[in-house]
Amino acid sequence: EIIVIDNASADNSVEMMRKKFPSTRVISNVDNLGFGKANNKAAKLAKGRYVCILNPDTIVFQKTFEEFIQFHEANPTIGISGPQMIDGTGQFLLESKRGLPTIKAAVFKSLGLFRLSARFFGQYYNLSLPQNQNGKTDVLAGAFMFMRKRLYDQLEGFDENFFMYGEDIDISHRRWKLGYTNFYFSQSKVIHFKGESTPKNKAYEKRFFNAMSY
């Protein structure tokens, strides 16, 4: 099943979706509820064993979901998994796998020191785990998150105190308290055009810094 939730867009995309994809369930919000609250609303309607949180500015491949289902079926202790994300030019996106953003890790990242030494300064982007190697990681990107519906319900979804940004870090960390592992599934790739659905303005900057401070 495909559930599309629209956060008060003004570009006629709701009408387009309903016309071109009549089998898709489209929910149109009158107001912009924010990333987490909107996804929680959609997830409550999902009936499958698995849920995949997927941004509108992504492209998945023919066997993407099949690969993730098979991976989770074979690994019952996996909590949340995510793919190797690349941008529209084919460049690897570092946020595909991350460590917890401690103050030290965030400082190293903001100063660009991770480019000098992955071993000493690469915690933010979990650079100890190679790009093309599957492995455990603390944080996965909200642009593509795959997990069992049961786990999503146990976690009570995203924390709706985050309007946008930071909710993926929060939910990735909370699954640890339930004894599950997050996993970077490098052999499955997804194209992410990175922010094409988000306007960059003062409100965007404020939401980002508020999320990082929460």
Task: State the predicted function of each range.
Residues 6-15, 31:
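A conserved acidic beta->alpha catalytic loop
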Residues 100-137:
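Short, flexible, basic/aromatic active-site loop/helix in glycosyltransferases
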Residues 28-46:
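Glycine-rich, basic loop-to-helix element that forms the pyrophosphate-binding segment
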Residues 13-14, 38-39, 63-65, 77, ...:
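Acidic donor-diphosphate engagement hotspot in glycosyltransferases and nucleotidyltransferases
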Residues 59-95:
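Conserved donor NDP-sugar-binding/catalytic core segment of glycosyltransferases
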Residues 169, 173-214:
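Active-site-adjacent helix/loop segment of glycosyltransferases
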Residues 127-165, 174-180, 185-187, 193:
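Aromatic-glycine-rich donor-binding/catalytic loop that engages nucleotide-sugar donors
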Residues 51:
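Short aromatic/hydrophobic "clamp" motif used to bind/position activated sugar donors
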